[in-house]
Every structure is written in structure tokens, then in C-alpha cells.
Amino acid sequence: MKLAYWMYAGPAHLGVLRVASSFKNVHAIMHAPLGDDYFNVMSSMLERDRDFTPVTASIVDRHVLATGSQRKVVATIHRKDQEDEPDLILVTPTCTSSILQEDLGNYVARAAPYTKSEVLLADVQHYRIHELQAQDRILEQVVRHIMDPERQKGTLDTTPTPTPSANLIGFFDLGFHHRDDSRELRRLLHGLGIEINSVLPKGGSIPDLHQLAKAWFNIIPYREAGLMTAKYLEESFHIPYIDRTPIGLIETRKFIGEIEAILQTRGVDRHEYYEKFIIHHETIVSQAAWFARSIDCQNLLGKRVIVFGDCTHAATITKLLVRELGIHVVCAGTYCKYDEAWFREQVNGYVDEILITEDHTQVADTISRLEPAAIFGTQMERHVGKRLDIPCGVISAPAHIQNFPLSFRPFLGYEGTNVVADLIYNTFRLGMEDHLLELFGGHDTKQIGESQMAESISNSKGCQWTPEAEKELAHIPRFVRSKVKRATERFAQEHGYPVINLECIYLAKQSTSVDIETIQHLLFNDETEVQ
């Protein structure tokens, strides 16, 4: 645990609450002080569901600190059991209330005999793991809690469904495009002739857990949550699982191939049908294959980008950029340090550098050092891109409200491939808008350009520019101006120029090979919008 003003993944109790709020008729009781109870507000703002978030805060105040928490926690459990009649009540402390070292397990044990609902204490180390790890562990804990007693008594129905079926495990509230990904994956499986046995936890219920063992296989679209549940089902009921994420045409084809292989082990051969299905969707349904061969996409060849996010999205987007669009990924990274080995294995050979860190300042420093043409990352990388004047597309959580759209925008499957291709192309294209306004004119272009230039110069780190130097810098196209400006300032600091004048600019051009021919090459050959 460390103090930080930005975290890529939240504290563990957020993962617990996301599991509870994703299920139908499951209620969470959070034992926490005021200040830790922001989940309801955050969930209401981002998810925009019609229903209230099923989370109740058992507030730790001065009275509780003086008399103990047992009476309050037990009373809250009994009250929510009577009011809401949930199938399961999930009790969790937060990292703050864990400092009190209270025996919440004992409180739950005292309350459970007098409730109609199942009551379960979230078994996670709040100081050792973060949000993504917690939701993975808690989902597995809930599944075990429901299925193990029936399995031990031999009353659990494990008869496979008569036709091929799958469990979709790993869709959560506040997940990055999870609602739309779930719809698209259902549609893809329907086209492949696969029935949906259960979906967990988003949209699922506790009674659905009794049916999990009837599926032919499990699908885990995101490594961050659901993998522990899939491994438990494989060990206990011998149900295979697929953990490949179908983002991009190549990965979607491999995903379908893994489904075909599982069906063949059950004596079902659909090879010919699946081949026709893939060809039809790659040539007609998905526009991404055609787009990759278009002149617009050809202009993206060799572009230098940085990718950063969770393991699943960072790895799959990196491979899509390199294999399907020919874009040069100079650095790919993830904040999921616990899954570093898998991530390195996935992106090895596709990138120049690999960055594994939870520190957003290291990511910002890497972006500043490598100066890519675009960034594909989280909301934090979007902020960094705005500061450095580098366009950024958000491809991973954490994200803001614009990445919880009301419209249908999946990342998985063939429709998701179209969405991702649009995101990639528009990220580059929008980076040219300011320059095109400057070049061809627009409303108040001159005033806007001058004010932005003045702001840019005023933000220089310890470097003063003469009016002549500012005028010369203004002649450089906007999309490479910030790069030329940083290179010139770096040259001035290294060679002891207190003020940047025309002589300093010309010497910097010579030393870094940033001359007029280079700028013209960038302007007329390297950018997509200038023909």
C-alpha cells in the first residue's frame, strides 16, 4: 500500500463491490469510514443504470470506535436481509477500516443463522492486492461458496447441455466497454451455434451458479477477472476454458479455432461451416480487413506509437496495431505487475520496449522521451497526451465517462474490430486538426494560433525565446512544432544558451537534422490528411 494521487487500479474493496453490484439480487455491506463510500456515486455516474447500486455503508464513526462494531454490523446485515431479501449478502471492510483489526468473520458468523440470505465475508488482503485482483478472487470465492456444498453432497447437476454451450465469465459493472462486449460476444457465439449457459457476474444471479457445471466450456474474455473461477471449474468439473480475447481479425480467427478444437473433442465437427463463417465476416461484415488495405491506412504504416493499459487490452491492441495495420509500437506496457510474465510473452517481438509499472510518472516520462505520433492508453495517458500535444486513444480502464457510451461500441468480435479501427484512425487524424485550421484558415484562426503559441512558449522549462525565434517557430507546422520546440530547448540547455535566438534554432536544426526538407517530408508524405 502506498500514498498516491493517481492509481491505475483502485483499492481491493472496489473489486468486491463491483462483483456484488454486477450480480442480480446480491447486496454488499461495506464497513468503512466516511470518505470510502464513494462507490455508489461513481457507479451511478458511469454505469447510468436505472436501479440503485446494491451497496450499503456501515459507517465507522466515533461512537463505533468507542463501543465496537459488532452490534452495528450485525444489525445492518439483519436489516438488509429483511428489506431487500437478497440471495447473498457480501460483507467487506475497506483498507481504512481494516486498520481496526476487527473480527468481521465472527460478526458474520453471528448474523448468518438469523438471516434468510447467504452471508459471506470477502476474503481478501486489502493491503496486498488491488481492485482487479480482488474482483477475480471474490468471484471465485462466491462460486465456491455456492457450488462446493452441493458438489460434496453429490446433488449438483453436472449433466452437459444437449447442444454446445458456454459460460461467459468476467463481465462486471464499471468494466471497460463490458456491456457492449457482452452483447457482441453473445452475437458471435450465436452465429457459431453456441448456446449461452450462464453469464457471470454481470446480469447473472446466485441461482445461475447451480447451472455452471452443465456448460461444455467457459470463455474468459479478460485475464484480469474470471480466470480463477475458470480454473476452479476446470479442476472441479473438468470444464475446459478459453482465455483468448477476440480483439482484431487474427485473434478472433484463433478464438473461433479454439472453440472448434473443443467441439471436436466432443465429436462435433464444424470445420467447414466455421471456415465459411470466418471468410464471410472478414470480407463482408467487418470493414477492418478492407480498411487495412486502403490508402488511408497505408499512410499509417511505420507510425510510432505507445500502448499502455491492463494486460488484456494492451497486449491485444499492440498485436493488432503491428500485425494488421503495420504501425510501429515503440513501447507497450501494463500496470498489472502481477501478470508481468504473461504480458512479456504476448508482446515479445512486437515492440521495442516493454514497460511494467504502476507509476504514472514513469509512463509520462517514457512518452516524453520517445515522442510517439500517438498514444493508446488509459485516461491518465490521455491527460499526458494533452499536455505534450500528442493525440491519445483510450483503449483500457481506468477511463472517464466518455468510455461508458450509451451507443453500441464493443471492442470484441467483428463489430469490435470496426470500432477499434475507427479509434486508431481517428486518433491520428484528429491530431492534424489544429494544423489544418492554421494552414487553411478558420474562425479566429490567427488569434487562436497566436494565443496557443504564446502559451506554449510561456510553458517552456527555463528557456526564454526571442521574438524572432518565436516567429521562426510559428512557421513550423503544428503537428511537428512541439517536437522541434523540445529538441531546440534541449539543445539550448546542453550548450548553455540562456536565451533561444535564431542562431540557436539553426544550430539545433543542424545537430538534430530537423531541417526544412525533413519538415516537408513529414508534411506531405507522413501525414494522412495532407494530400
From Swiss-Prot:
Q: Please indicate if the UniProt record lists Protein biosynthesis as a keyword.
A: no
Q: Which GO terms describe its biological process?
A: light-independent chlorophyll biosynthetic process; photosynthesis, dark reaction
Co-factor remark = Binds 1 [4Fe-4S] cluster per heterodimer. The cluster is bound at the heterodimer interface by residues from both subunits.
Q: Does the keyword 4Fe-4S apply?
A: yes
Q: In which pathway does it act?
A: Porphyrin-containing compound metabolism; chlorophyll biosynthesis (light-independent)
One GO cellular component term of this record is: chloroplast
Pfam short name (any one): Oxidored_nitro
Q: Where in the cell is it found?
A: Plastid, Chloroplast
Q: What is this enzyme's catalytic activity, as reactions?
A: chlorophyllide a + oxidized 2[4Fe-4S]-[ferredoxin] + 2 ADP + 2 phosphate = protochlorophyllide a + reduced 2[4Fe-4S]-[ferredoxin] + 2 ATP + 2 H2O
Q: Which UniProt keywords apply?
A: 4Fe-4S, ATP-binding, Chlorophyll biosynthesis, Chloroplast, Iron, Iron-sulfur, Metal-binding, Nucleotide-binding, Oxidoreductase, Photosynthesis, Plastid
Record-stated family: Belongs to the ChlB/BchB/BchZ family.
The family database entries (NCBIfam families) matched by this protein are listed as: DPOR_BchB (TIGR01278), PRK02910.1-3 (NF002789)
* Physiological role: Component of the dark-operative protochlorophyllide reductase (DPOR) that uses Mg-ATP and reduced ferredoxin to reduce ring D of protochlorophyllide (Pchlide) to form chlorophyllide a (Chlide). This reaction is light-independent. The NB-protein (ChlN-ChlB) is the catalytic component of the complex.
Protein's name in the database: Light-independent protochlorophyllide reductase subunit B
Organism of provenance = Nephroselmis olivacea (Green alga)
Instruction: Name the gene for this chain.
Output: chlB
